[in-house]
């Protein structure tokens, strides 16, 4: 699929999509909750659908209603010998420890870029928890057999916090008592805040000791309970809408909670620092262009903000410096190099200097033919940058957005953007 974006202005109001970070964690909690869970404002991205597929394979019954999912579960009871997590990094890292609560042998696999991402974390940690594991030289597929036995362990938190998220769910639901998960060099702390928030909502108790140790005293959920959970608006997808507003607005974005623990809420600080016309309110954010100037930003704890930050920085006068490049290698693409290459086609110079990215902005963009590299955030970043470029921009493999924000192009159109979609003939 190709998307052709014409230069133009945006105006109007749009609702942010549902957070896949929140949605996927809610699916995990609903599986582990022995009872009925109602999930309101559910997402429908590819990653969200993959999470629902996983919990169904593990025994949950899912009924879809109008803006609500009803999930009935008795815990992890695999009905199949294989589970596929799609292309969801969070899905594979979070659900694998949960799957290991079962004593049945299970094959865990994924698709696309997930097949090349490192999974040797499980090779190292699972034997310490009584789990048999075999990987494909540190890659998928994984063959595992539990049951997981919660014990005090020490893990490396520098590659991804998602492994810790999975262990926290598995320990909590597995009845961990008097044991700790100790973590060295934890990155993306806000995502652990979100995990702890969901665990608490469903009645599980975990003591966070300064993000260096997570202690389980025992207790928590015993009897079956009916739960209700509302999925938050997505700051990750919403960041692209907000940057679009700063470049080509003014627009209003609804459905984003400024009190959220989501890491990508930090986009507000970047928008403020660069001089965008920003007015946050309760569940509503007004955003429009200002005299945009270069800014400095540390994205170590929110690496998914790199693509929208780069799109923003291209319109900011001067050299913007973004820290945290080391977090970009194991995404859907190698995002540091991909951003450099694809934005280079639009005339933007991006320098990579160790852990820092330098974007030389304010010099105008030229429409070009760019490629998503099958990465949803690259596709959205290019689309947003194209809104004020000189000439048309064509995004190849534009359907990559379906991973997290399938309504993205439609939402741009609702705000007045001219987006022409060309689908391949089958």
Regions found by a protein language model. Name each.
Residues 1-426:
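Short, structured segments at the rim of ligand-binding sites
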């Amino acid at each position: 699929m190709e998307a052709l974006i014409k230069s133009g202005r945006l105006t109007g109001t749009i609702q942010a999509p549902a957070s896949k970070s929140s949605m996927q964690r809610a699916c995990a909690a609903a599986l582990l909750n022995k009872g009925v869970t109602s999930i309101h404002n559910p997402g429908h991205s590819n990653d969200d659908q993959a999470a629902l597929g996983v919990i169904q394979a593990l025994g949950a019954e899912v009924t879809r209603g109008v803006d609500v999912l009803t999930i009935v579960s008795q815990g992890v009871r695999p009905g199949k010998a294989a589970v596929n997590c799609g292309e969801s990094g969070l899905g594979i890292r979070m659900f694998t420890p949960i799957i290991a609560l079962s004593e049945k042998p299970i094959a865990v696999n994924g698709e696309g870029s997930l097949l090349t991402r490192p999974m040797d974390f499980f090779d190292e940690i699972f034997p310490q928890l009584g789990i048999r594991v075999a990987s494909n030289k540190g890659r998928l597929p994984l063959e595992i057999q539990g049951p997981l036995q919660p014990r005090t362990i020490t893990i490396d938190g520098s590659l991804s916090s998602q492994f810790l998220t999975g262990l926290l769910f598995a320990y909590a639901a597995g009845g961990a008592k008097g044991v700790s998960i100790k973590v060295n060099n934890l990155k993306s702390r806000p995502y652990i805040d979100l995990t702890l928030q969901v665990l608490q909502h469903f009645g599980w108790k975990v003591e966070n000791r300064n993000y260096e140790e997570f202690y389980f005293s025992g207790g928590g959920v015993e009897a079956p309970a009916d739960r209700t959970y509302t999925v938050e608006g997505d700051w990750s997808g919403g960041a692209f809408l907000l940057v679009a507003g700063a470049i080509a607005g003014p627009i209003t974005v609804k459905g984003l909670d400024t009190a959220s623990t989501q890491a990508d809420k930090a986009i507000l600080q970047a928008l403020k620092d660069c001089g965008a016309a920003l007015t946050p309110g309760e569940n509503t954010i007004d955003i429009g262009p200002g005299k945009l100037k270069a800014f400095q930003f540390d994205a170590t704890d929110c690496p998914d903000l790199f693509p929208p930050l780069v799109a923003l920085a291209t319109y900011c006068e001067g050299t913007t410096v973004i820290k945290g490049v080391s977090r970009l290698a194991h995404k859907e693409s190698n995002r540091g190099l991909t951003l450099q290459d694809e934005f280079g086609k639009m005339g933007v110079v991006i320098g990579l200097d160790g852990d820092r990215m330098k974007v030389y902005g304010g010099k105008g963009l030229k429409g070009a033919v760019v490629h998503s590299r099958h990465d949803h955030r690259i596709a959205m970043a290019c689309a947003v940058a194209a809104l004020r470029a000189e000439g048309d921009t064509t995004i190849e493999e534009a359907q990559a957005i379906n991973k997290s924000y399938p309504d993205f192009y439609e939402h741009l159109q609702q705000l007045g953007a001219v987006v022409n979609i060309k689908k391949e003939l089958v």
